[in-house]
């Protein structure tokens, strides 16, 4: 079995990627403290063609050497904005017509594998701080909670790993894939 070179993968250029349709998902980072995690979010959002990232509170913003280390340039291909508070970001996104979801273990959360995205709907998914999770005041403002089913003793994943799991679930939904450039 021969590995495929990057050139043979036929990836779009940053300019082509900017013009391509995106998944109707915006990722909101609620006070993420690790710059490496922020970079991983950028890279994951690029891989799954998320619309944008909204960085909030203490979450670091590009340009940053530490973010770049894990983003590998995705901080330049995924649109992003910054809000001083996550509350402001959630309010703005709600006004833009997004359904707001907390990726968190909360009462009434839907298990990710049972969640059914609605065609034509835009989603803003809030990922919380590495220690405290999504702030309670933000969870209170969300339309729904999403929980990743787990079997281990920790019932916890690194926040950027959680992003990969959740965004893959949205990306793999045929109802949301319309127009996406999905590789091999």
Task: Go through the PLM ranges and name each one.
Residues 1-184:
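Post-transcriptional modification and biogenesis factors for structured RNAs
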């Amino acid at each position: 079995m021969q590995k495929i070179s990057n050139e043979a993968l036929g990836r779009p250029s940053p300019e082509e990627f900017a013009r391509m349709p995106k998944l109707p998902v915006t990722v909101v980072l609620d006070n993420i403290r690790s710059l490496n995690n922020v970079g991983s979010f950028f890279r994951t959002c690029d891989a799954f063609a998320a619309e944008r990232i909204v960085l909030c509170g203490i979450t670091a913003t590009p340009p940053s050497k530490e973010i770049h280390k894990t983003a590998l340039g995705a901080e330049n291909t995924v649109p992003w904005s910054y809000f001083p508070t996550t509350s402001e970001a959630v309010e703005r996104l709600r006004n833009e017509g997004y359904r707001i979801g907390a990726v968190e273990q909360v009462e009434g959360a839907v298990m990710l594998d049972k969640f059914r995205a609605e065609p034509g709907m835009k989603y803003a998914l809030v990922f919380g701080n590495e220690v405290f999770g999504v702030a309670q005041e933000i969870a209170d403002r969300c339309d729904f909670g999403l929980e990743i089913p787990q079997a281990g003793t920790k019932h916890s994943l690194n926040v950027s790993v959680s992003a990969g799991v959740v965004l893959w679930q949205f990306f793999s939904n045929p109802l949301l894939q319309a127009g996406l450039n999905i590789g091999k």
